[in-house]
C-alpha cells in the first residue's frame, strides 16, 4: 500500500515529430535500493516505439528523479498495479 501519488504517462504509438534522437528509453540506468519512504511520487512511462518496456521513475522528496529497477519484486508489484489500474 503506497501513500505517494502515481502518474501513468502513455506516449504516442507513432511519434513522427522529426526528433528521433529523443526516441529512447528514459531509464538507461536503474536503482534497486531506495526506501519507499523517501519517494514523493511515481511516474510510469508506458512501453512504445521509444522503449520496449515500461519505465518506473520515482521522484524523491529531495526532488531528484531516479529510475527504479522494474525486476525487483516490490517495484514489479507497484508497476503491475499502476499499469492494470490505468488501462481501464
From Swiss-Prot:
Glycans are attached at residue 7. Heparin binds at residues 76-82. Pfam families: IL8. One of its GO terms (cellular component) is extracellular space. O-linked glycan consists of Gal-GalNAc disaccharide which is modified with sialic acid residues (microheterogeneity). The modification Phosphoserine is found at residue 41. It comes from the Eukaryota. Disulfide bonds join 25-51, 27-67. Keywords: Chemotaxis, Cytokine, Disulfide bond, Glycoprotein, Heparin-binding, Phosphoprotein, Proteoglycan, Secreted. It is found in: Secreted. Homotetramer. Interacts with TNFAIP6 (via Link domain). Interacts with CCR1. Interacts with CXCR3. Interacts with THBD; this interaction enhances generation of activated protein C. PANTHER family: PLATELET FACTOR 4, SMALL INDUCIBLE CYTOKINE A. This is Platelet factor 4. It comes from Bos taurus. The gene is PF4.
